[in-house]
Amino acid sequence: MPARSAVVVIAMEPSSSITIASSSSYLSNGSSPCSVSLAPPGAGAVAAQAAPVAAGEGGGGGGGGGGGGSSSVEVVSLNRLSANLERLLLDSDLDCSDADVDVADGGPPVPVHRCILAARSTFFYNLFAARGRGGDGAAGGGGGGGGGGGERTGGRPRYKMEELVPGGRVGRDAFLSLLGYLYTGKLRPAPDDVVSCADPMCPHDSCPPAIRFNVEQMYAAWAFKITELISLFQRRLLNFVDKTLVEDVLPILQVAFHSELTPVLEKCIRRIARSNLDNVSLDKELPPEVAVQIKEIRQKSQPNEGDTVISDPVHEKRVRRIHRALDSDDVELVKLLLNESEITLDDANALHYAAAYCDSKVVSELLDLRLANLNLKNSRGYTALHLAAMRREPAIIMCLLNKGAAVSQLTADGQSAMSICRRLTRMKDYNTKMEQGQESNKDRLCIDILDREMIRKPMAVEDSVTSPLLADDLHMKLLYLENRVAFARLFFPAEAKVAMQIAQADTTPEFGIVPAASTSGKLKEVDLNETPVTQNKRLRSRVDALMKTVELGRRYFPNCSQVLDKFLEDDLPDSPDALDLQNGTSDEQNVKRMRFCELKEDVRKAFSKDRADNSMFSILSSSSSSSPPPKVAKK
């Protein structure tokens, strides 16, 4: 009886059809439920038995048997069989798998049942049959060396996804989705956090995670020869092309070229040809023949603009030589090329190129030359930091930020590096809680780095800026830093004095009052002849000195800094009168006195702990400052 049931399942498959049960917006991002059936593998005894049974059933477009009662019974039976097979994937306690597959994004291997995969896919049938006959496990027509992944204890085979799907990347979620279809005959809707990005302003119908998920599914469906899914995913990809940014069209074009999807490929080529995507990106991201085709279309459709773009072949040649030197990780050669020609790093957009295509070491060495404008925008309105955010490489983002890249710079369409990174990050990766000692997700790490920088530098203020709004922001930042340093001098005078000496904060005038050396207590006189640019430089120099003071305090006196953080965030009152212990009702005065005693004890403990932990810090301060080290009064 079980054998007959298996034959009936295969016989019913050709008469099944695709059913969509949701709106088109859900369909576009791959999250709509649909049911698709697979044609028989066409190899082995199972396929030989399927043909006569299918003929006996009639094989028509709608039915699977004789009467209506028989049809309904078969539908119920098939749904029950589908649910039972799905348990093999979902129920961790029911582990009767006999092979494993390592996926591209790491983590534990995915267990599979070779008998089910072989019955449902000619790819897996050929792969496992070749291994059973003593072969290397390579499936004919592009299966890869699946058997080369090694053996577990007990002879359990292990396959690598990059060998099963050569030329394409398939992540865990996309592979599990395809497995679910092979096991159950139904393509379940994609989880929302897999096809949605971490940008709260995104509608999530065509954001990069949804595109990547469908691209990965297409790679897998093409490699596993699941023809009906190829047709479904092709329609989804066609829907994405005109709705998303041109950068997100590139992976669609790549999978269309790899999987020979002519309609998708032609539509992607037309979209990119109409865009302002530069030739460097075309040459680096696309197959050579496709890049040439796009350039030819541009020259034919816009001949006049084509002549102006390639106006200086010598200049273009010099730019390509610098880019090739960067590809070779040879920054010394870049310096030689700059010396022997009149071209600059900015002319060649060398920093943009390195941020997009080179490793962090090359970017760091290029920044050390101090010959490139960190915030220069290329022809498409992107800075090097924007390109590093698109690449989602934490080391490169940190290199640029440490050298002074402006985190608040916007692209032509109003995107910041933070919003770019959020748009490229899956909600699943953003919300994943990392255990201690576990490697952090790179996408989430990039967002955290940019987020901290946005908090530290909420707005880049140029020397020439005279906008009242920007000036107010600078004043607010100065007031916060002045208050923080003032409370540090009140609570921790010795530590504050050392930190201010090393940061040279005592050489810049305080904001709004006379320097501490003066005892008049009067407000600082306003220089009416001071230009806005001069005033801005003076205020920024004070901000830099105070910022360095705070950073030194966090580095060498962390416990004192924690007390200051808590006081400024939780205990600092809105009104100065609230600090007076004599004001307020008797209950309020008691609360103030209790909190004052608690704060006093926190200050004493932090002072003692930092003093014990940093007993050698006075040596550092004496070597970092021209003035003699301060003498700390003994208690």
Curated annotation (Swiss-Prot):
> What Gene Ontology molecular function terms does this protein carry?
zinc ion binding
SUPFAM superfamilies (UniProt xref): Ankyrin repeat, POZ domain
Q: Name one Pfam family in it.
A: DUF3420
Give the binding site residues for Zn(2+). Answer: 197, 202, 204, 207
Gene Ontology CC entries for this record: nucleus
Gene3D superfamilies found in the cross-reference section: Ankyrin repeat-containing domain, Potassium Channel Kv1.1, Chain A
- Give positions of region: Disordered: 138-157
Pathway(s) the chain acts in: Protein modification; protein ubiquitination
Q: Where is the composition biased (Gly residues)?
A: 138-152
Task: Give the UniProt record's GO annotations in the biological process aspect.
Answer: defense response to bacterium; defense response to fungus; regulation of jasmonic acid mediated signaling pathway; regulation of salicylic acid mediated signaling pathway; systemic acquired resistance, salicylic acid mediated signaling pathway
In terms of one coarse class, where is the protein primarily found?
nucleus
Where are the annotated segments for Salicylic acid-binding core (SBC)?
439-576
C2HC NPR-type zinc-finger residues: 194-208
Positions bound to salicylate = 484
Q: Where in the cell is it found?
A: Nucleus
Q: InterPro entries per the record?
A: Ankyrin_rpt, Ankyrin_rpt-contain_sf, BTB/POZ_dom, NPR, NPR1/NIM1-like_C, NPR_central_dom, SKP1/BTB/POZ_sf
The UniProt keyword set, sorted, is: ANK repeat, Metal-binding, Nucleus, Plant defense, Repeat, Ubl conjugation pathway, Zinc, Zinc-finger
Where are the ANK-type repeats located? 317-347, 349-376, 380-409
BTB domain location: 97-191
Q: How does it assemble?
A: Interacts with NRR. Interacts with TGAL1 and TGAL11.
The entry sums up its family as follows: Belongs to the plant 'ANKYRIN-BTB/POZ' family. 'NPR1-like' subfamily.
> What information about domains appears in the record's comments?
The BTB/POZ domain mediates the interaction with some component of ubiquitin ligase complexes.
Function statement: Salicylic acid (SA)-binding substrate-specific adapter of an E3 ubiquitin-protein ligase complex (CUL3-RBX1-BTB) which mediates the ubiquitination and subsequent proteasomal degradation of target proteins. May be involved in regulating basal defense responses against pathogens, and may be involved in crosstalk between SA- and JA-dependent signaling pathways. Does not seem to be involved in defense response against the bacterial blight disease caused by Xanthomonas oryzae pv. oryzae (Xoo). Over-expression of NPR2/NH2 does not confer disease resistance to Xoo.
Question: What is the name of the protein in this document?
Answer: BTB/POZ domain and ankyrin repeat-containing protein NPR2
From the UniProt record, report the name of the gene that encodes this protein. Answer: NPR2
